[in-house]
Amino acid sequence: MTTKDHSLATESPTLQQLGEFAVIDRLVRGRRQPATVLLGPGDDAALVSAGDGRTVVSTDMLVQDSHFRLDWSTPQDVGRKAIAQNAADIEAMGARATAFVVGFGAPAETPAAQASALVDGMWEEAGRIGAGIVGGDLVSCRQWVVSVTAIGDLDGRAPVLRSGAKAGSVLAVVGELGRSAAGYALWCNGIEDFAELRRRHLVPQPPYGHGAAAAAVGAQAMIDVSDGLLADLRHIAEASGVRIDLSAAALAADRDALTAAATALGTDPWPWVLSGGEDHALVACFVGPVPAGWRTIGRVLDGPARVLVDGEEWTGYAGWQSFGEPDNQGSLG
């Protein structure tokens, strides 16, 4: 906890002392909504415009000590992360996020200033994409729980599904891979070097705008890397009935960027690149040239549905599952 965070914890009234409605008023007062929000907080529900009559909706949750730690992250970091991971799901559909609805649970003795900092982080991240926080709920519970529902607009484009990949197309990524997993390992091992990697675990950096750009040029299928590259590509392979073959050479830049951190930890960087989640890069399949900012990392072949690396099965840990068992870390040849 930083000096500033300690100040928030010691000088602020608690959520219980203020009461639910006073806390909510503090969190929403003076916030400017984007033009797509026709009615924000203050009524029974919000009203958000849907430009082409369709709405893209996604929900995700963060639970303290499962998805974030308050001895690593500031409340503002948690707020930014909660919005970023939901916005990435909207991006992966080829849409843009326009509004977010937030649920927050915390112990009654939580300083109200910490809740305010959480919402500040949410507004900061939402502002990066021109979206707003339009409502939510506040409850008392034993630990912090943050639930975010994202609302998005396709702006007249067709949605990009997981099921559209076809043999003969190329696989491309925009964004960086393995950074969050490397940062997590550094945090767990108490290594204070590699500040940027440690930061990337706390606050991901989705490639905002690139989902819509991919949809505009006819991306066949797309997903954001939340659970790990291999795990998320398996969703596309199974939904589309195709085989995906990744190129290790095309991913070497990600490996090289993590080599120094891996050396400090005495480990191999490849599992971070292939299996590490929470980077929220976008991966998509294209028939023609890939859009600016994207890089080709593999190809799509006829089924059966599998994900390979240089034509071979990856035998190590393949990615996060909320109810899965821990696995070994694996290696690349």
Curated annotation (Swiss-Prot):
Specify the superkingdom: Bacteria
* CDD domains for this protein: ThiL
Catalysed reaction(s)? thiamine phosphate + ATP = thiamine diphosphate + ADP
The residues that hold Mg(2+) 4 are 44, 58, 89
User: Does the record's keyword annotation contain Transferase?
Assistant: yes
* Catalytic activity, EC: 2.7.4.16
Q: Where does ATP bind?
A: 136-137, 162, 226
Q: Where on this chain does substrate bind?
A: 67, 278, 320
A Pfam family annotated for this chain is AIRS_C
Which parts of the sequence bind Mg(2+) 5? Answer: 227
Any one GO BP annotation for this protein? thiamine diphosphate biosynthetic process
Q: Which family does it belong to?
A: Belongs to the thiamine-monophosphate kinase family.
Q: What does this protein do?
A: Catalyzes the ATP-dependent phosphorylation of thiamine-monophosphate (TMP) to form thiamine-pyrophosphate (TPP), the active form of vitamin B1.
Misc note: Was identified as a high-confidence drug target.
This chain's protein is named: Thiamine-monophosphate kinase
* Lineage, broadest ranks: Bacteria, Bacillati, Actinomycetota, Actinomycetes, Mycobacteriales
